[in-house]
Amino acid sequence: MAALVALHGVVRRPLLRGLLQEVRCLERSYASKPTLNEVVIVSAIRTPIGSFLGSLASQPATKLGTAAIQGAIEKAGIPKEEVKEVYMGNVIQGGEGQAPTRQATLGAGLPISTPCTTVNKVCASGMKAIMMASQSLMCGHQDVMVAGGMESMSNVPYVMSRGATPYGGVKLEDLIVKDGLTDVYNKIHMGNCAENTAKKMNISRQEQDTYALSSYTRSKEAWDAGKFASEITPITISVKGKPDVVVKEDEEYKRVDFSKVPKLKTVFQKENGTITAANASTLNDGAAALVLMTAEAAQRLNVKPLARIAAFADAAVDPIDFPLAPAYAVPKVLKYAGLKKEDIAMWEVNEAFSVVVLANIKMLEIDPQKVNIHGGAVSLGHPIGMSGARIVVHMAHALKPGEFGLASICNGGGGASALLIEKL
């Protein structure tokens, strides 16, 4: 080592110079342990959720994303120039044009120099965008970021295969089904996977219907009590020759007839099936965004955080068992955070299907009264690229100071993401 020290400043031969740099790097890595920055949520905003071909159908995902990003930055009270990078989840991108997150970001008036990335982890996309942004902030690559998710299922196109047009016409495929809702490994719909879970976990049609009705009831009560007011940014829609229409409330939860729910036919499995249009989530439009930053940046910008990112994790299982995947991600998060199930004040388990929540409550042995307390995707709607971010947004507002909330969401292919926050 003394000989190497003596060479400092006088080494000209490339081999020795490279060796010296390697030794310096080794010295530094052994001498110091890197510390991660604390990441906080400064604002958390979402658009209302529109029904399929409903109130927001005229707005592409990128426009909804623009509204969410703009709303989150305004709520944070920081200059747009402070946002160093943007990640947004978006699943079915066909027909949206290049780089959807870039479109949403520039539409929100952020500087042209802002890097943008679109994340696709199917239904977990919005949550994964938050996790990836948190990692960048923790490591010090950036100090202020926006992350969230967006989807307009009303605007997803039909496609046809390229090539010569065959005799007899062409077959159009619905990209909602092909790219969003089909298990490519077993070549079955997500709903058939959910039916498999219902059978495996012994969860009846009646249990699922009861849960679905509870979701609708909780959503209505939450809206009536103003539980969503602080997280919504209204969407103004221009209508030719008519006054502008302002959408400021979720559309889906009002569209239910409780008396018809038990009478509906099953959708995916005709004989001995359990899943219906009522106890599954719907196709929807919406976007959500959060302003994330390091605790140091929050201090520098003199902003008060809503919550801190405490831990997060992904998990994966057999693709057909995707509804059960959250039950494997959640224990990882609790372990990383050093917490027990009993420490969690509020759980969000995305309601892709009612059976998903019922199965995960059963596997995790958690209190149903603490799960999706203000309803979920069955009643509010499930814009697939948005939902993972939406449940984090809601927790950031619904928790009380000092409480922990844990959100989890399954995704096609057998995956899940889970994220823990602490309200500040």
UniProtKB/Swiss-Prot annotation:
One of its GO terms (molecular function) is coenzyme A binding. GO terms for cellular component: endoplasmic reticulum; mitochondrial inner membrane; mitochondrial matrix; mitochondrion. It comes from the Eukaryota. Keywords: Acetylation, Acyltransferase, Fatty acid metabolism, Lipid metabolism, Metal-binding, Mitochondrion, Phosphoprotein, Potassium, Transferase, Transit peptide. CoA binds at residues 216, 255-257, 260, 281. The keyword Lipid metabolism applies. The modification N6-succinyllysine is found at residues 63, 75, 171, 178, 187, 199, 220, 227, 240, 242, 260, 263, 265. Pathway: Lipid metabolism; fatty acid beta-oxidation. The modification N6-acetyllysine is found at residues 63, 171, 178, 187, 199, 220, 227, 242, 248, 254, 260, 270, 335. The keyword Transferase applies. One of its GO terms (biological process) is acetyl-CoA biosynthetic process. It catalyses: 2 acetyl-CoA = acetoacetyl-CoA + CoA; propanoyl-CoA + acetyl-CoA = 2-methyl-3-oxobutanoyl-CoA + CoA. Activated by potassium ions, but not sodium ions. Pfam families: Thiolase_C, Thiolase_N. The active site is at 123 (acyl-thioester intermediate), 410 (proton donor/acceptor). Its main location: mitochondrion. Its EC number is 2.3.1.9. Residues 1-30 form a transit peptide. Transmembrane segments: none annotated. Homotetramer. This is one of the enzymes that catalyzes the last step of the mitochondrial beta-oxidation pathway, an aerobic process breaking down fatty acids into acetyl-CoA. Using free coenzyme A/CoA, catalyzes the thiolytic cleavage of medium- to long-chain 3-oxoacyl-CoAs into acetyl-CoA and a fatty acyl-CoA shortened by two carbon atoms. The activity of the enzyme is reversible and it can also catalyze the condensation of two acetyl-CoA molecules into acetoacetyl-CoA. Thereby, it plays a major role in ketone body metabolism. Belongs to the thiolase-like superfamily. Thiolase family. This is Acetyl-CoA acetyltransferase, mitochondrial. It comes from Mus musculus (Mouse). The gene is Acat1.
